[in-house]
């Protein structure tokens, strides 16, 4: 395990002992400035004991800067997983197997109760993707799944829920929306999400086969529970930064990249500078044209198209993530 102190020592060796002219010899000035800002943030993080496990910065093709404050091992990325789910949705749509207008009640007709809520038939895939299903509360979150709420059949459980809010009219963050969207993909393509994403995304991006939480019926959890390293997590951001292209191969359509990153809901200004808006399974960030995949406790990939950069961080479940978020915002992302 590389400690923060050890990392700081290595940085001093690389950045402080070498003369500036030698330090940046042959490098693009933009990379030089990025490395300086990255090191400044690292020093701030170390001196303030920020609860960080890793931070990576990349462009479309490669990792530019990286620091680890804990073992470089796959960890739970929580709701960052949702952005992989919407990637699968886009792939299935491009194959003509799925549509944003598809109705949940029709797809899961075999799981409907005898007296479903009348609003259930109004819910479409597009409502699930922007968290406006109308169920009106957070469902199938980690705190629900752990004690077995909804088990063994999440589809049957959700079809029996009341829908008190007009679908599409209000934002309500819920993992159940993402889980249903993932199940719609599976029914459309005839494969489990893990297999589908492995063929279409994980394998082309050299990510292997990630460990992933499954429900009691064997469905991968479309709302969370995927395990990745920081740089593996960042690869999704690099794919979107490159408008769906990976090393010359178009993986996701440019139109879908634009669609998911366009705000479907915008929020009133608040004390949280990151609470800006929501697209399709991506949050909108407060930097020009930027958006992010965002998982609990600080598993975040921020895509900065105007800067040509992606920034990913991973944080432990313990500690004050708000402190990390403020520092990342004020001492790094705003400085780029």
Name every feature range the model reports, one short phrase each.
Residues 61, 76-101, 128, 181-185, ...:
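Active-site SXXK
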Residues 180-184, 224-245, 299-315:
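Active-site-proximal alpha-helical segments within enzyme catalytic domains
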Residues 209, 258-310:
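Active-site Gly/Thr loop motif
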């Amino acid at each position: 395990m590389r400690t923060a102190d050890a990392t700081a020592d290595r940085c001093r060796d690389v950045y402080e002992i070498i003369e500036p002219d030698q330090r940046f010899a042959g490098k693009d000035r933009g990379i030089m400035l990025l490395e300086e800002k990255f090191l400044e943030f690292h020093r701030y993080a170390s001196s303030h004991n920020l609860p960080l496990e890793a931070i990576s910065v990349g462009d479309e093709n490669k990792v530019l800067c990286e620091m680890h404050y804990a073992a470089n091992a796959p960890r739970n990325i929580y709701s960052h997983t949702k952005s992989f789910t919407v990637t699968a949705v886009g792939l299935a749509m491009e194959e003509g197997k799925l549509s944003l207008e598809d109705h949940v009640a029709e797809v899961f007709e075999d799981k409907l109760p005898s007296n479903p809520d009348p609003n259930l038939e109004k819910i479409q895939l597009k409502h699930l993707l922007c968290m406006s299903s109308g169920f009106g509360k957070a469902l199938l979150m980690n705190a629900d799944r752990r004690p077995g709420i909804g088990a063994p059949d999440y589809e049957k459980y959700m079809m029996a829920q009341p829908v008190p809010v007009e679908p599409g009219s209000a934002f309500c963050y819920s993992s159940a929306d993402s889980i249903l969207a993932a199940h719609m993909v599976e029914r459309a393509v005839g494969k489990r999400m893990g297999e589908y994403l492995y063929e279409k995304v994980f394998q082309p991006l050299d990510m292997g086969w990630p460990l992933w939480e499954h429900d009691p019926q064997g469905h991968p959890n479309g709302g969370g529970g995927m395990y990745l390293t920081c740089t593996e997590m960042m690869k999704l951001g690099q794919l979107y930064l490159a408008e769906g292209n990976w090393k010359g191969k178009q993986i996701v359509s440019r139109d879908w990249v634009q669609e998911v990153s366009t705000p479907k809901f915008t929020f009133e200004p608040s004390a949280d500078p990151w609470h800006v808006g929501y697209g399709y399974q991506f949050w909108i960030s407060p930097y020009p044209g930027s958006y992010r995949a965002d998982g609990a406790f600080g598993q975040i990939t921020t895509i900065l198209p105007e800067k040509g950069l992606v920034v990913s961080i991973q944080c432990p479940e313990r500690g004050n993530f708000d402190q990390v978020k403020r520092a990342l915002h004020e001492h790094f992302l705003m400085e780029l």
